[in-house]
Each structure stands twice: as C-alpha cells, then as structure tokens.
C-alpha cells in the first residue's frame, strides 16, 4: 500500500478506538470495560485459563467454583484460544484487571485488521476495505454488545468464510485445511458462535456446491484421504468440549428463545446508541423486546446503501453464496409477531443452549460487509462520481455510528479492583485447616429482601486464595445447583447432599460467610 493508504487505514482504526474507548476505558484508561458481573465473570474465566497454563490449576474444565461440581468451565464461553493473549499480558506483570482491559483493546485491533486483510485480499480497494473493517469492528451492532465481551471475539469469521469460498472455487486442500483451523479457533473460544455459525455455513456450502457443481463433482475425490483425516482430527478435537457443553445445565425453552429474536425493523433503524438517532429511534422501541441488544442497524442511510448494493450484487457469481446466505439466515432468525422459522431449528436440541440468539448477527456482519462493498466497487468502477460515493459512504458510516455518551457500560477500575477485597479479608480471617471450601450466604431472615450476593467476587477470592467456593456465576449452572442471588444455608445443604456429602462433613468442612447487604461476617 502507498503511504496515504496506510495512513487512512490506521486513521479509521484510531477513530474507531476513540468511538468505543471514551466509554469503555476513559481518556486516562481509568475505567474497566463493562460491569462487575458479566464482564468480570469473563475476566475470571481468562484468569482460570492463565492459572491452568501456569500449573496452578490442575484441571482445565473443573475450576473450583460451584464446588464440588466437576467441569464447571463448560457452563459458558471458555475463551481458551484468546486466553493466550491474556496470559501473555499477565506474564508481562499486569494484574488481572488491567490485563483484561488491554486484552479487550487487542480484540478490537484483531477484528479490525483481520477483516481489513481479508477484504483487501479479496480484491476490495483499501478505501472500502477500511470502511468495511470499521463496520466489522466499531459499528452500532458491535457497540451494543460490549458489555458481553465474549461477543467481540469475531476475528476468525472473515477467515472462515474466505477459505470456504476459496476451497469451492479452487478445490485446493490448503483452503480446506485453513477453513477447519479457523473454525477450530472460533470453537475454542465461543460455543455460542461456533454453534450459531453452522446455520449460515450450511446455506453458504449448499449454494457454493450448486454454483460450482461441475468442478466440485470433478474434484470431489481429490486429496480425499487428507480431507477425511482433517475432518476426523477436527471432530476428535471438538468432541470433549461438545460432550461437556451439552451435558451441563438445562436447555432453554423455545418460547424464551423466540422472544429474544429481532424484528425486521431492527436491521434498518438504530434502536439506541447512535448520537444522530437519539430521539428518532425511541419511537421504534415498541416494536422490539430489549431493543439495545437487538441493534443490527449501521444507521438508516448506511444500511440502505449496503442492502441496496447487496440486492444489485446477486448477479455476480462469487457474491451469490454470500447474498443467499445473508437473506436466508436473516429469514431464519427474525420473528414476525411470536413466530420465527428458528423454532424449527430448535428441534435440534443443541441450539437450545444458546439463549442470546440475537448475537448471531455478529456472524453475519462479514458476509453483509463483504458482498455490499464488493458490489459497490464493481458498479462504480467506471462511474465519474465514484469518489463522491465513497466519501459519502464514509461520512454516513462515521456520523451514523458515532455513539451516544455513556451508551456503553464501564466501571471505574479502582471499584473493580476493590470489589472483592472485603470478602477476601473475612475469608482469610475465618479460614481454618479443616475447611475444604467456603460459601457466601444470607441469614435466613433476609431471604426475599432482594439482597444479592456478589457471586463473581467469590470466584475471584477463590482464585486469589486458592480456596474453593460453593458459589459461582455462569450461563448454565451444574445440575442440581440452585444458589443464585439469595443463597441460604439450607440451599448449601441441599446442593452438597445432591453431591453425596453427609451432614457431619457439611458442618465441619464448609466455611460459612454471611452477607447482610452491607458487610461480610
């Protein structure tokens, strides 16, 4: 690239970081991206992985929360692959909270430059590739999910689609292998995305086979042995996590999942978060349950331009699989009233593990961006006002995706660093040699008073003191566990008896820490 092109690409990245950074980290990097619960829980999982790599934790799957349950890590996204980045930051001497904050910044960097690389490698010029990378990394749909940091880990997705397309176009084994490598990377990070991506990949594969039918049938047996070995190794590598994931916790009901799907209007109108639409978008809230989480629009103008050129691009052979995938996937995941075609997908029970199905759109971002920008480039190739269209698109993207102040959650990092300290001091003070674990509970008299135990703090204390906790926080709790916001001693007894503990062992081996809403004792 020429020097101007490099400056432009970096400048767009810096603008994106400013957009998300003023809320997530603050000007002085004094804030923690997210809240004290979901976000800090992801931090705990990354810390567990780091501790396992260091040899502090003896089991990867069985972290010592929800004690004495086994395979507690499988209750949510396990972050195995991205924890390598986090672990490097920890080894550099940063504490778990600053490591996490910097890790989030690196995720944005990975998303931006990986998507830019694939877009540009696919023949899209640097200007449109920069715009596309911005939309993939910093647009409203991404900002709407920043409290759920695990949804930011999407950098493998452009590679997955790119290598799958290249395989069907060339029938070369190297693309087949690279597709499975990047799918494995995604799988070792997020069961959510690796499950939901199966639907668009199914449509993409079927469409690609149809349009490349003659070539596909001619070379179907080429490198067949290597392909079979690759598939077998892939399934061997995913099977342990898959079996644990399906057997942990309960499955969501169909009605609960369908309720969380988006309506069609979500794809065009920003519901929340855009400075430009801060008053206009409120009118449309009544059309969508929990609208901020169903933010799929890049802005009314930007979305209109992108989908207009997606429609126009359907005549291009290389874009056809992407475009069919986009519309069929949207059709599957979008509800009309209380009905959605996704209800038929839910007959496959593994899909009931995904409650937050609205996150599927993160997977579809790349196909939408790729096919629309490729179409724009082709239709404006000999157009005199091409530069005007490019600049207009850039301006609309930057203005429509400029976020409202405080539209993304953050917490002062000192508050995060101190949130568990009082509990940790009490546990250290009361701990005795005979104790095998600790639990934070409410006095019976406070049950039903809406006093919530900070469950994530109990997990951090367990990690700091290497002292197992019966408390825990995750998407899917272990079977038999019923100790969430207002746990009492009877809940503890029920849980431990479910795991085969006798009364005497329960009384002697468990350190009880009470919480009255203000202090631990």
Where are these regions (language model features)?
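Start-transfer (signal-anchor) and selected internal transmembrane alpha helices
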Residues: 1-25, 220-233, 317-322, 521
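Membrane-interface coil-to-helix junctions
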Residues: 16-111, 139-144, 148-153, 261-285, ...
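Membrane-interface helix-loop junctions at the exits of transmembrane helices
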Residues: 18-25, 52-57, 128-146, 236-249, ...
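Hydrophobic, aromatic-rich transmembrane alpha-helices
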Residues: 298-331
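Extracytoplasmic
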Residues: 399-521
